[in-house]
Amino acid sequence: MIEYIKLFWEGAPEGEPTVILYEVDTENERLALRSIDIFADGHTRNIPDLYDGAIEITPIPTVEELNAHVWGEEFRACVIEKAEFEAIWESRTYNGELKGTGEIG
């Protein structure tokens, strides 16, 4: 099964994405198939292989883990629809929220 996650990174360092979208294969150790970095100025970067050149392959945490702050207080996440991921992937544009507010999930 494929799951689509929108991760908000509050206080992301300059040059890092403030929103990251993941396409996660839940039946293959929660590895990302593709991801999209979205930066504070609105530009996006499609990443067809998140693990290309990686020394260590790390699974993508669940939305519940991210919202429980297991990975840090600065992360909030929600599940999104495939259509939203694909629209941003294809258009390379993002006009959505750049900060996670309140409880997401």
PLM feature segments, named:
Residues 60-105:
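Short, compact, well-ordered microdomains
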Residues 7-10, 27, 85:
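Short amphipathic alpha-helical "recognition" segments used for binding
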Residues 18-27, 105:
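Broad, structure-driven detector of short, well-ordered beta-strand segments within folded domains
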Residues 26-71:
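Acidic, aromatic-enriched beta-alpha/helix-loop junctions
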Residues 8-10, 23, 64-66:
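Intrinsically disordered, low-complexity segments enriched in polar/charged residues with Gly/Pro
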Residues 17, 31, 80:
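Short, well-structured alpha-helical interface segments that form or flank functional binding sites
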Residues 1-19:
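Short, extreme N-terminal segment that most often corresponds to the first beta-strand
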